[in-house]
């Protein structure tokens, strides 16, 4: 057992794990088989999603249908039946706080048991959570037994007094309820509710990047999530409800063409950095109300795209400047479907005046940032250890259940 990522209690697993990412543009499912900690993706599903707006569920039935379509695709490819999933939770209105608890060890022998770990986690959660919020996760970071600090797993040790130090994440009840409702209505159980930026920062960055501090910007279809990890902890998240769909809408409005045409133009000819494009390269655009296609040059399309991408990135810069995040040495990592746009790294480097790189998953058939979240949900869920699971059942409403997920 090793502790990767300061605080997130991880261990290598064997078994089957399923990740579910309910995005604004699409719902992604990944089935992964772990053999002694080695991950092998055996099934993928990706279904168009119409039930979300700006990252939030607005139509439960449509979201349920998209989940079922994505699950069916993954089941067919993997040749298994999916009964339960690990589902990503967006960072909207997420709050992060440190917590600590202290107890007297209960058994007469003074040997620390699972029950003591659960009790000390309960003591750390004695706080008033506002009625509209609920605890999403508690992550034990270390324990102190009779003054001995830095213990990662105190079970089996002897002690009279035990303390736990950790981090607690809370989120809005409405968002959590709607996600649970959609998954359950789709006929699936939930193993882990995983905070997506927590899984993402934990699994796509190196130990050094997590330790010294790095910014991760996840550019989705409906929203952009900016996260900061430092000292191996997710310290900050911010959600801007603008994403790749807004770029498509801008193209549609400016060029007076349908949303589907605009999406095709963005994918086939789009570039976020006009300096890299040519005003002489032209392509035909079907314009509403005109019988003949209109010729549009690459540079003009790029300027439309640049305006929106710049606005999205500048909003991230504003919130990051407030917390001096650009002083962290890890620079900026971009990911998410909208980040696959050519030229986006150049533009981001110009805006942030920092080192920027694009993260692309390194799995065959999934080498697209659109799959970064769903893969990280699987990896994160598979690596959670016993201490995490014991502490989790200190959260009101959590019932003890196995970690595996098929």
Across the structure, where does each feature detected by a protein language model lie?
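Glycine-rich phosphate-binding loop of actin/hexokinase-like ATP-binding domains
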Residues: 212-254
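Glycine-rich phosphate-binding/hydrolytic loop that grips phosphoryl groups
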Residues: 357, 361-405
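Nucleotide/phosphate-binding catalytic cleft detector across ATP-hydrolyzing
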Residues: 1-26, 30-215, 233-234, 244, ...
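Residue-level signature of catalytic and energy-coupling elements of molecular machines
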Residues: 20, 29, 87, 183, ...
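Glycine-rich phosphate-binding loops at beta-strand->alpha-helix junctions
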Residues: 171, 271-273, 328-349
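Hydrophobic alpha-helical bundle architecture
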Residues: 318-336, 351, 355-363
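Core structural elements
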Residues: 89-94, 221, 336-340
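Extended, folded domain segments that form the structural surfaces/walls around functional sites
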Residues: 21, 184, 205-206, 218, ...
């Amino acid at each position: 057992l090793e502790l990767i990522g300061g605080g997130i209690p991880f261990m290598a697993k064997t078994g089957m794990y399923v990740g579910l990412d309910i995005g604004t543009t699409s719902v992604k499912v990944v089935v992964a088989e772990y053999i002694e900690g080695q991950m092998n993706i055996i099934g993928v599903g990706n279904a168009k999603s119409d039930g979300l707006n700006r990252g939030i569920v607005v139509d439960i039935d449509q979201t349920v249908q998209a989940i079922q379509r994505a699950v069916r695709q993954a089941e067919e490819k993997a040749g298994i039946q999916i009964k339960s999933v690990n589902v990503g939770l967006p960072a909207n209105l997420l709050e992060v706080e440190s917590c600590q608890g202290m107890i007297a060890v209960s058994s007469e022998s003074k040997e620390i048991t699972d029950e003591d770990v659960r009790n000390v986690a309960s003591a750390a959660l004695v706080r008033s959570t506002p009625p509209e919020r609920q605890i999403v996760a508690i992550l034990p970071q270390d324990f102190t037994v009779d003054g001995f600090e830095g213990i990662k797993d105190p079970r089996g040790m002897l002690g009279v007094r035990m303390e736990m130090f950790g981090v607690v994440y809370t989120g809005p009840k409405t968002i959590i309820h709607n996600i649970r409702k959609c998954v359950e209505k789709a006929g699936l159980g939930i193993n882990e509710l995983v905070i997506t930026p927590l899984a993402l920062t934990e699994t796509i960055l190196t130990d050094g990047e997590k330790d010294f501090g790095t910014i991760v910007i996840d550019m989705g279809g409906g929203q952009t999530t900016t996260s900061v990890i430092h000292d191996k902890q997710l310290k900050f998240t911010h959600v801007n409800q603008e994403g790749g769909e807004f770029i498509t809408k801008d193209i549609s409005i400016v060029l007076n063409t349908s949303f589907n045409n605009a999406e095709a133009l963005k994918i086939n000819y789009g570039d976020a950095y006009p300096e890299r494009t040519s005003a002489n390269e032209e392509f035909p655009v079907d314009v509403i109300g005109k019988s003949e296609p209109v010729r549009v040059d690459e540079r003009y399309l790029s300027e439309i795209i640049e305006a929106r991408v710049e606005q999205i990135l500048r909003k991230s810069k504003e919130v990051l400047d407030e917390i001096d995040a650009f002083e962290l040495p890890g620079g900026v990592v971009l990911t998410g479907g909208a980040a696959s746009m050519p030229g986006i790294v150049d533009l981001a480097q110009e805006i942030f005046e920092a080192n920027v790189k694009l993260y692309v998953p390194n799995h065959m058939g999934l080498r697209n940032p659109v799959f970064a979240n769903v893969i990280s949900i699987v990896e994160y869920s598979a690596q959670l250890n016993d201490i995490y699971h014991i502490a989790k059942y200190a959260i009101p409403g959590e019932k003890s259940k196995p970690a595996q997920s098929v």
